[in-house]
Amino acid sequence: MILNYQLYILESYIGQSKTAAAVTISIMSVVTMVVALIGSLTSGAISDKLGRRKIPVNIASLLLAIGYLLPWVMKTSFSMILFAGFAGLGYAVYGAVDQALNVDVLPNKEEAGKDLGILNIATTLGQTAGPIVTSALVGMAGYNLVFPVAIAFAVLACIFIQMIRSVK
């Protein structure tokens, strides 16, 4: 919900000029790249070693929620850079471990392609709905409402992950 609107958040919510927002987004991109590399390369292996999927996915959701919280409570460009770090790491961990979780919950390994295709549709629909929901929220109440809703979605992700009974 936040990623697609970074420029607008920096300009309209934080109050930066186009030039300052461009600099902040450049810094955010570097921060995100670094933490995403670290998170992607380490989280899957750690999850395998622990034999657990839910804990890393819940940690990832918590990191995302912290990332969303920071610009909501601190309207500064620095809070957006912190957002990039926390949310970038959270998204990387979530992406790596969630893929392993998806494979673990497949009902029939012989139909993995079909089942993963269905999971991909669900993921794509969520990514498509995010900007639509964000646009509606901004239209209703500005960016102040976007952050708590994003936090709520991260918390809901934790709750739904806990409902999966077939994996630890």
Description of each model-found segment:
Residues S79-Y94:
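Hydrophobic core of transmembrane alpha-helices in multi-pass small-molecule transporters
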Residues L62-K75:
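C-terminal ends and interior cores of transmembrane alpha-helices
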Residues N4-V23:
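Short amphipathic helix-loop junctions that connect adjacent transmembrane helices
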Residues E110-G139:
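A late C-terminal transmembrane helix in Major Facilitator Superfamily
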Residues T134-A154:
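A membrane-interface helix-boundary motif in multi-pass transporters
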Residues K49-S61:
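Cytoplasmic membrane-interface "Motif A"-like loop-to-helix N-cap segments
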Residues I38-R52, V138:
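Helix-to-loop junctions at the C-terminal end of transmembrane segments
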Residues V93-P107:
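Intracellular juxtamembrane helix-capping segments at the cytosolic ends
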